């Protein structure tokens, strides 16, 4: 009847809609995992979305931000905040060649940034030798990712804790670190969080594995016409062990009636990751299959 019947709400808000929602809903905490480019017809450049959020986030909202994201880490500078992040791992492949790097220059003085390490795109740690700008330190820090045991170690404001790794990608680890940071700020203990995390699984609509005969079939979803999302999946395919055949089904069902979408996103996407000796075959499907073939040929596949 127009009255709140719960004490707590967890809301996922569309960035574009935030300007309409935040005047009426003032979150206690706001978690932003990252800001990247989206499809051309929707959000396009990350700075466009940054400006919308930066102007409309309520002053009293405490932010939980990714210290490794040089875009979202700068949101609403006057607000109270904590940061989460992932330390550089000993066996981690960094600074992979990529088309999109949205923060090559210092956001404060415009000089070229020096990256201490770049995990992918603009995710990593950087500093400016001219004005002193640098990536913030993480309050909630993933210090160790143990792929063999499927566990991660985190420093929760200086206190060490061990958690199950939910998912296998670095994106999954960032999502988990962000969730742990928010819940820690709410006052949940590491032991409470451990018990809850043990029950978590990645939904199969996003990622699934199935054994068919002697073949391991992996399905991974990327956001439609999104160059960063597709590039991350391509990188994951490249880094997966063993010989691989890749089937690209990149058509967006939402565009089924209008298949003449802007194809420029294909040339922002790192198809070069598929130019790898471990990939023995690439199959393209859908109405844009010939466009994908041309892009693959340009990538040397």
Where are these regions (language model features)?
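Glycine/charged-rich beta-loop-alpha catalytic/anionic-binding loops adjacent to active sites
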Residues: 91, 156-165, 211-217
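Gly/charged, well-structured mid-domain segments that form the phosphate/adenylate-handling core
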Residues: 133, 144-149, 182-224
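A conserved segment at the C-terminal end of the G1
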Residues: 1
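A conserved, hydrophobic alpha-helical segment in the catalytic core
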Residues: 24-34, 123-137, 164-198
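A short acidic, amphipathic alpha-helical/loop segment
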Residues: 19-24, 71, 196, 232-236, ...
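Flexible active-site lid/hinge loop adjacent to a nucleotide/diphosphate
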Residues: 4-6, 10-116
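Cys/His-rich short segments
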Residues: 87-153, 166, 277
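Active-site beta-alpha connecting loops in nucleotide-dependent enzymes
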Residues: 203, 221-300
């Amino acid at each position: 009847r127009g009255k709140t019947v719960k004490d707590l709400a967890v809301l996922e808000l569309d960035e574009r809609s935030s300007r309409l929602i935040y005047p009426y809903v003032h979150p206690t905490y706001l978690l932003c995992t990252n800001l990247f480019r989206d499809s051309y017809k929707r959000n396009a450049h990350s700075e466009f979305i940054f400006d919308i959020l930066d102007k409309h986030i309520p002053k009293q909202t405490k932010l939980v931000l990714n210290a490794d994201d040089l875009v979202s880490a700068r949101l609403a500078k006057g607000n109270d905040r904590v940061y989460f992040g992932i330390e550089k791992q000993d066996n981690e492949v960094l600074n992979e060649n990529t088309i999109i790097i949205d923060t090559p220059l210092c956001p404060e003085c415009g000089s070229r940034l020096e990256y201490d390490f770049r995990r992918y795109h603009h995710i990593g740690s950087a500093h400016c030798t001219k004005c002193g700008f640098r990536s913030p330190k993480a309050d909630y820090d993933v210090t160790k990712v143990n792929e063999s045991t499927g566990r991660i170690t985190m420093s929760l404001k200086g206190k060490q804790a061990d958690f199950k790794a939910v998912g296998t990608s670095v994106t999954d680890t960032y999502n988990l670190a962000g969730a742990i940071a928010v819940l820690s700020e709410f006052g949940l203990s590491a032991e409470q969080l451990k018990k809850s995390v043990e029950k978590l699984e990645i939904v199969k609509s996003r990622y699934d594995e199935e054994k068919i005969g002697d073949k391991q079939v992996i399905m991974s979803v990327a956001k439609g016409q999104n160059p960063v999302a597709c590039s991350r999946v391509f990188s994951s395919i490249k880094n997966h062990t063993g010989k691989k055949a890749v089937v690209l089904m990149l058509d967006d069902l939402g565009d089924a009636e209008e298949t003449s979408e802007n194809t420029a996103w294909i040339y922002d996407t790192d198809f070069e990751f598929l130019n790898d000796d471990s990939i023995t075959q690439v199959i393209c499907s859908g109405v844009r299959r010939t466009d994908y073939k041309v892009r693959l040929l340009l990538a040397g596949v």
